[in-house]
């Protein structure tokens, strides 16, 4: 029985260690990421809203988030290239 407990407890400890390591890796990747997690979803939502009013190619939309270290300010920048032909109102 003692031998069985030894092997069972070893598996539990190993899985806990693996889980902890994975959590550390994920948290480090999030810290090092310059782009917030919500930015891709925000870009998709903006494209949907803009497409309601004009014909727009998704590739002409540029979304960027800058971080100013001096004042700890985040700046959200949105650039859209509107072709002259596609300024037709869709409503």
Swiss-Prot record:
Record keywords: Cell cycle, Cell division
The protein's role, per its UniProt record: Prevents the cell division inhibition by proteins MinC and MinD at internal division sites while permitting inhibition at polar sites. This ensures cell division at the proper site by restricting the formation of a division septum at the midpoint of the long axis of the cell.
Database matches in HAMAP family: MinE
Pfam families on file: MinE
Lineage of the organism: Bacteria, Pseudomonadati, Pseudomonadota, Gammaproteobacteria, Enterobacterales
Signal peptide positions (record): none
Record GO biological process: cell division; regulation of division septum assembly
Name of the featured protein: Cell division topological specificity factor
Entry keyword annotation includes Cell cycle: yes
Family: Belongs to the MinE family.
SUPFAM superfamilies: Cell division protein MinE topological specificity domain
Database matches in InterPro entries: MinE, MinE_sf
